[in-house]
């Protein structure tokens, strides 16, 4: 169980709102095209209002001192999307290891779970410890130049588990 699961989460009532156009985000969303069960394309890009307010301030400052922008790679995820991506990551890890698996016996493969849980929170339905992205308070962000190109930052975590197969 990841450390964040031990931290009780209480909803502070901050509204989940659409990310404004002054912030850049990937379009189309990489998980949408994998078949992640978002209700529709317009429901994808949301965060808690306070998170957005802080991101706007950071982005404005970044633009004022450089030619970079924040580029949001992922934001709020409904629990159904979290579950879809978690299961997909497990299947891809099993495929890489040539393991035939069902979700009923996943606990028999702790090494697979350990790899997946490095990047994906378990899709918990417990309201006291939801996956961070499902709260609307977590996001994945990169830097882009003024033309929208990703800035190399030493890691391509953004692309993990988003290609059609693990061999791509």
Predicted regions and their residues:
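N-terminal secretory targeting signals
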Residues: 1-9
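Acidic, His- and aromatic-enriched active-site or binding-groove loops in soluble protein domains
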Residues: 91-135
């Amino acid at each position: 169980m990841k450390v964040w699961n031990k931290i009780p989460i209480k909803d502070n009532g901050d509204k989940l709102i659409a990310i404004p156009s002054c912030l850049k985000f990937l379009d189309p969303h990489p998980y949408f095209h994998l078949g992640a069960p978002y209700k529709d394309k317009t429901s994808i890009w949301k965060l808690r209002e306070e998170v957005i307010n802080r991101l706007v301030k950071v982005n404005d400052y970044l633009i004022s001192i450089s030619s970079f922008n924040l580029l949001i790679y992922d934001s709020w995820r409904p629990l159904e999307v979290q579950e879809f991506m978690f299961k997909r990551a497990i299947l891809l890890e099993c495929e890489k290891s040539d393991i035939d698996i069902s979700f009923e016996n996943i606990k028999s493969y702790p090494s697979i779970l350990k790899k997946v849980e490095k990047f994906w929170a378990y899709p918990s339905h417990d309201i006291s410890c939801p996956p961070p992205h499902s709260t609307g308070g977590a996001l994945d962000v990169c830097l882009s130049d003024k033309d929208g190109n990703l800035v190399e930052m030493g890691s391509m975590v953004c692309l993990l588990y988003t290609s059609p197969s693990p061999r791509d």
